[in-house]
């Protein structure tokens, strides 16, 4: 029994030299191999954020304590992160830390006991149907990227607030007999929407789209599709914010707003 305890103690002492970065890299690789790409990306974003806080210096898992995590929380707030963003990063780091504890890599020191890991209720930011009409009728012919951003916003609105990731991966074969049928990336739920002229008008604006996808978001067959999607959503949201300023909106205009605007308009009809 004494020998067994000594061996376990020795293993903990050695394993405690494992760093947060190396441990998370293994987790990220495992998530990617199991097809959980979005989750792996959130872990990667969390690790990148924490490493910026550490000025690129790695930290031993055994050295993670409450003081360090409180410092990271202060850093995030100073960067302008919302409390939900702070909580998002902290919960991923806590899950990673607890996994290391479960595997016997380190002893539990409860480094997250003084930082925020809750979820604040966010304000649903919708715009009125009047503003949506103004957006639709804006002359954006001077900027191809702004016009594309507006078209993607309107397509989302027309399709009951479809998320951008679902829009990006819509295939031409998903459209049959006047119905658009697709499976949500986030939940796996199968949805069907009646195909309307307003949707077809947007698709027809981009006749040079020769990929298997319905919309010209993922257009390069041999390039990383996830990367194309991420680059596109960043550019679209950036252009939408510019459009929002032109419209005199108080809050930033993003693809997220399209989803809530459709829900708001739909509720108003009932």
Predicted regions, residues:
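Basic/aromatic-enriched alpha-helical hairpins
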Residues: 2, 6-79
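N-terminal DNA-binding recognition helix of tyrosine site-specific recombinases/integrases
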Residues: 49, 78-111, 160-162
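Flexible interdomain linker/hinge and immediately adjacent N-terminus
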Residues: 70-71, 106-139, 220-226
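Short pre-functional
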Residues: 94-95, 150-163, 265
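Active-site/catalytic core of tyrosine-dependent DNA strand-transfer enzymes
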Residues: 132, 196-250
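Conserved catalytic core of the tyrosine transesterase superfamily
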Residues: 137-154
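Short, basic (Lys/Arg/His-rich) helix/loop patches that form interaction surfaces
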Residues: 142-144, 237-270
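Conserved tyrosine-mediated DNA breakage-rejoining catalytic core shared by Y-recombinases
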Residues: 169-205
